[in-house]
């Protein structure tokens, strides 16, 4: 869904780097490893959090139930 706030293994905060990571890959055409090097993500446990993440938030939004009192 969304990137976890911290690395599951070491606890380092990583979520603040997600948008810059996506920008480096999509807009600047960098390889994922190069983007992580530039962001200073050097621990393999933190790198796996980025490399294995699948962003499914947009795909799941149509299936969320409407909230009570909210217009449809």
From Swiss-Prot:
Cofactor annotation remark: Binds 1 zinc ion.
EC number(s) stated in the UniProt entry for this protein: 2.7.7.6
Family annotation (InterPro entries): RNA_pol_su_RPB10 (IPR023580), RNA_pol_suN_Zn-BS (IPR020789), RPABC5/Rpb10 (IPR000268)
Keyword check for Ribonucleoprotein: no
Location within or outside the cell: Cytoplasm
MF terms (GO), sorted A to Z: DNA binding; DNA-directed RNA polymerase activity; zinc ion binding
Cellular component, GO, one term: DNA-directed RNA polymerase complex
Record key words, sorted: Cytoplasm, DNA-directed RNA polymerase, Metal-binding, Nucleotidyltransferase, Transcription, Transferase, Zinc
Family to which this protein belongs: Belongs to the archaeal Rpo10/eukaryotic RPB10 RNA polymerase subunit family.
Record's function text: DNA-dependent RNA polymerase (RNAP) catalyzes the transcription of DNA into RNA using the four ribonucleoside triphosphates as substrates.
Subunit architecture: Part of the RNA polymerase complex.
PANTHER family: DNA-DIRECTED RNA POLYMERASES I, II, AND III SUBUNIT RPABC5, DNA-DIRECTED RNA POLYMERASES I, II, AND III SUBUNIT RPABC5 FAMILY MEMBER
Name by which UniProt lists this protein: DNA-directed RNA polymerase subunit Rpo10
Source organism of this protein record: Methanopyrus kandleri (strain AV19 / DSM 6324 / JCM 9639 / NBRC 100938)
Organism lineage string: Archaea, Methanobacteriati, Methanobacteriota, Methanomada group, Methanopyri
